């Protein structure tokens, strides 16, 4: 089984992916972790690396390559803002493609708690990062990140806690047609 989970920062994609991975015994591959690791390898902050990635397409190409390679082996949760799009462009059909969304201020508070920084700083970084990514996705892939038409399930994650979101997805998985 291949499941993609996408969403903007602070929507709960990592938490949800981990819960699903544990429940279904699927490997968890996260594009964000790959991106963060690459930023650390280059001694850059996420903001600096996002700016760097805008003009260096090899960053996205490497992340994509690793995601497609993982998906080809099957049985995984592929987490990333473009996970669903990358598989679509590679002619790999996931069993379920999910997008999590949440109110920007809810996301900002979640990010500030996760990163242990004040909300104003988290908001500034979030806006900058999302603008950078949106630009990059359009230029490199001709993808509008706001186009949710490829997803089987779109969940407003600010309405439920992590277990509530997990329960919705669990029901969807358990009711997939064979």
UniProtKB/Swiss-Prot annotation:
Pfam families: Cytidylate_kin2
Enzyme type, top EC level: transferase
Signal peptide region: none
Annotated catalysed reactions: CMP + ATP = CDP + ADP; dCMP + ATP = dCDP + ADP
EC number: 2.7.4.25
InterPro entries in alphabetical order: Cyt_kin_arch, Cytidylate_kinase_dom, P-loop_NTPase
GO molecular function per UniProt: ATP binding; CMP kinase activity; dCMP kinase activity
Subcellular location, principal: cytoplasm
Binding site for ATP: 7-15
Subcellular location: Cytoplasm
GO cellular component, one term: cytoplasm
Alphabetical GO biological process terms: pyrimidine nucleotide metabolic process
Keyword annotations of the record: ATP-binding, Cytoplasm, Kinase, Nucleotide-binding, Transferase
Naturally occurring in which organism (per UniProt): Methanococcus maripaludis (strain C5 / ATCC BAA-1333)
Protein name (Swiss-Prot/TrEMBL): Cytidylate kinase
Family per similarity comment: Belongs to the cytidylate kinase family. Type 2 subfamily.
SUPFAM superfamilies the UniProt entry points to: P-loop containing nucleoside triphosphate hydrolases
């Amino acid at each position: 089984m291949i499941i993609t989970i996408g969403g903007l920062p602070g929507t709960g994609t990592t938490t949800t992916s981990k819960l699903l991975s544990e429940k279904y015994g699927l490997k968890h591959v996260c594009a964000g972790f790959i991106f963060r690791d690459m930023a650390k390898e280059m001694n850059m902050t996420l903001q600096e690396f996002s700016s760097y990635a805008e003009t260096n397409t090899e960053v996205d190409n490497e992340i994509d390559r690793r995601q497609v390679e993982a998906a080809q082996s099957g049985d995984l949760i592929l987490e990333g803002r473009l996970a669903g799009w990358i598989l679509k462009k590679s002619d790999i059909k996931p069993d379920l493609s999910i997008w999590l969304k949440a109110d920007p201020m809810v996301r900002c508070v979640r990010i500030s708690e996760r990163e242990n920084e004040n909300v104003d700083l988290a908001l500034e970084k979030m806006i900058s990062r999302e603008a950078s990514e949106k630009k990059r996705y359009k230029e490199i892939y001709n993808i509008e990140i706001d186009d949710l038409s490829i997803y089987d399930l779109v969940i407003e994650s600010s309405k439920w806690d992590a277990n509530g979101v997990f329960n919705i997805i669990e029901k969807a998985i358990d009711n997939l047609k064979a």
